[in-house]
């Protein structure tokens, strides 16, 4: 803790991109698979709903945090500290300053997710007053060995995510309720790599999925017209399977709330298995500030 006195937390600037990307790359297993281009897009997006802070220690950026705000709630997308600066209280500083900033903006509840294997991070957040809100399964399947079915009556359109509109449909992961709007804004303005598929029946939108594709096809979010729209989910899975095969992707990854039992069951029937899980945590700032 001796070095914390020389540390300052400030709003991130575009010139911090290289430092943030370096820290992110070293923390990818803990945080996820976002690209350099995505981080750059986040920093370039001028929105009052995005809060990005960095911590400087002796003039060098050693940590950062990104959060999305939606009305009186916020979702912490990431907090990361450079390996060389860990154990000095920087993570606590970043979280504390972020919570203060969000509280000033009218945020009452803050949410975040922690990978189930990351016990150190889980204990860190529990120690800061966060509690368990839910669990998300990360389910994966090999497209070459998936069950294939023909789902009649549905049409599938593949587009760039930047062309997506806002639809009145329900995400299959809880955090998407908070991040979907700002993600779409980033896609439209700066980030062109993300793809989307729209599933329709009788000219009505039944499902929307955003994803990125490389060695693996990684789904960011699947939204359905209702949680009973099983056929629409099946048509979506078939479309993802076809895209993965055409792209040479070896796996498809889909996140889904563990509480959505019917959806989990269906995805398993197509050959998917739970490869990982994430804890959703929440803290009520109205009782702390």
Language-model-detected regions and their locations in the chain:
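Active-site rim helix/loop that mediates acceptor-substrate recognition in acyltransferases
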Residues: 17-21, 28-57, 61-66, 174-196
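Conserved beta-strand in the GNAT
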Residues: 54, 60-68, 75-80, 198, ...
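A conserved beta-turn-beta hairpin within the catalytic core of GNAT-like acetyltransferases
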Residues: 68-77, 86, 212-222, 274-278
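Conserved acetyl-CoA-binding loop-helix of GNAT-fold acetyltransferases
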Residues: 81, 87-100, 123-127, 229-242
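Conserved active-site alpha-helix within GNAT-family acetyltransferase domains
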Residues: 92, 116-134, 258-276
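Conserved GNAT acetyl-CoA-binding A-motif
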Residues: 102-113, 246-256
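Conserved catalytic-core motifs of GNAT/GCN5-like acyltransferases
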Residues: 111-114, 131-144, 273-285
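Amide-forming acyltransferase catalytic core, primarily the GNAT-like/NAT-type
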Residues: 132-216
């Amino acid at each position: 803790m001796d070095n914390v006195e020389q540390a300052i937390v400030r709003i991130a600037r575009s010139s911090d991109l290289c430092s943030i990307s370096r820290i992110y790359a070293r923390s990818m297993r803990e945080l996820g698979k976002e690209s350099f281009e995505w981080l750059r897009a986040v920093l370039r997006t001028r929105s009052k709903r995005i809060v990005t802070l960095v911590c400087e220690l002796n003039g060098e950026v050693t940590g950062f945090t990104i959060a999305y705000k939606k009305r009186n709630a916020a979702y912490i997308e990431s907090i990361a500290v450079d390996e060389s600066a860990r154990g000095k209280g920087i993570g606590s500083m970043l979280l504390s300053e972020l919570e203060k900033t969000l509280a000033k903006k009218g945020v009452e509840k803050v949410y975040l997710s922690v990978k189930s294997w990351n016990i150190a991070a889980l204990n860190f957040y529990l120690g800061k007053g966060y509690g368990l809100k839910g669990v998300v399964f990360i389910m994966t399947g090999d497209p070459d060995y998936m069950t294939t079915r023909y789902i009649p009556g549905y049409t599938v359109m593949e587009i760039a995510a930047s062309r997506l509109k806002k639809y009145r449909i329900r995400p299959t992961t809880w955090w998407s309720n908070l991040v979907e709007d700002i993600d779409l804004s980033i896609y439209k303005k700066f980030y062109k790599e993300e793809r989307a598929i729209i599933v329709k029946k009788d000219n009505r939108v039944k499902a929307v999925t955003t994803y990125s594709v490389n060695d693996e096809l990684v789904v960011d979010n699947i939204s359905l017209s209702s949680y009973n729209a099983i056929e629409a989910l099946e048509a979506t899975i078939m479309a993802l399977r076809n895209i993965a095969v055409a792209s040479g992707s070896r796996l498809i990854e889909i996140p889904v709330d563990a509480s959505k039992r019917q959806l989990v069951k269906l995805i398993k029937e197509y050959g998917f298995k739970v490869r990982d899980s994430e804890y959703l945590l929440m803290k009520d700032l109205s009782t702390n500030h």
